[in-house]
Amino acid sequence: MVKETKFYDILGVPVTATDVEIKKAYRKCALKYHPDKNPSEEAAEKFKEASAAYEILSDPEKRDIYDQFGEDGLSGAGGAGGFPGGGFGFGDDIFSQFFGAGGAQRPRGPQRGKDIKHEISASLEELYKGRTAKLALNKQILCKECEGRGGKKGAVKKCTSCNGQGIKFVTRQMGPMIQRFQTECDVCHGTGDIIDPKDRCKSCNGKKVENERKILEVHVEPGMKDGQRIVFKGEADQAPDVIPGDVVFIVSERPHKSFKRDGDDLVYEAEIDLLTAIAGGEFALEHVSGDWLKVGIVPGEVIAPGMRKVIEGKGMPIPKYGGYGNLIIKFTIKFPENHFTSEENLKKLEEILPPRIVPAIPKKATVDECVLADFDPAKYNRTRASRGGANYDSDEEEQGGEGVQCASQ
């Protein structure tokens, strides 16, 4: 048992109707009562009712709720909550699904215009400190002379050919299907109005709009991120009966030579010498704030290649919550050149540094004594190519793989 049968009765189908039967019933009602075919108020009301009924009964989830709880149950389940008031918004969408694009009349009431989007480029320093830019915008505004009418007061008449819609519909029947095509009115050229040439506004020549150049101050706030939007509400092009869209500036962060950004944090790759890495010392870096940071490494703390450390509060500003992110330091170690010191000094290093790790080789294993040679990518690419192998892309790949010369013992 269903709680209510109202929507079924409107479409003239039983409560056991299939989806196909409901669709056919709505199609029949839409053809009969659509405002473009039947302009009477009674037909308009019946079309709204049929559209609301089909909106519910064509959706399995909404239909199930309606069957169990009636219209009251739909108000809490994203349903219509009764018939929609005013206009033919969603009913027209359903109608167009059956009969092709252009089934609906032009939407009533003011429409929203398109947004105007621009990219604003900013360096990491500018995103840290903030920046204000003055940008010129060429936009369309309502004519000040005629206040957007296009002519003298009382001289603008509604186009009788399209009934002020600016569009016309052509209906064709192709077999059992009806197709409707929407075209621009050839009398008013889509404006919906007729203005006698002698009464046209001399400033805009009846176009109702004119061009204006406006300067906008764009504030890039400290801590803004790549892709963030700065919106000027209602500053896009104006047109009669149109709500102006927005002017939107999209922040584009330029790459930095020293820093990378990770959310509110900054990442910096610091190269230090081997002595500083193992015995402590200092290094310095120029921060995006413009200040220099002197960073100390405590003696006794060993910095390994690729190790990461953090300096708290030296990242990017955090706009919503205040404070700053962190500065993450990733270390690379600059090793000395070959033969940088004497054998005597190397022996002293042996006494200072932890003992060497002795390789563990099984007693009965066959041992080859090998010597490392410098790796030359060009040389080994030629060798591999002659064997049909792949080339090395860089000297960072497979380091030393074929740079070992062995002599059997």
UniProtKB/Swiss-Prot annotation:
Residue numbers binding Zn(2+) 2: 159, 162, 185, 188
Start and end residues of each stretch annotated as Disordered: 382-409
Q: Which PROSITE patterns match?
A: DNAJ_1, DNAJ_2, ZF_CR
Name the residues that bind substrate: 116, 135-137, 215-216, 247-249
Which residues are recorded as modified (Cysteine methyl ester)? 406
Q: Name one GO biological process term.
A: chaperone-mediated protein complex assembly
Residue ranges annotated for the J domain, each copy included = 4-72
**In residue terms, where are the CXXCXGXG motif repeats?**
143-150, 159-166, 185-192, 201-208
Q: What else is known?
A: Present with 119000 molecules/cell in log phase SD medium.
Stated name of the protein: Mitochondrial protein import protein MAS5
Q: Which organism is it from?
A: Saccharomyces cerevisiae (strain ATCC 204508 / S288c)
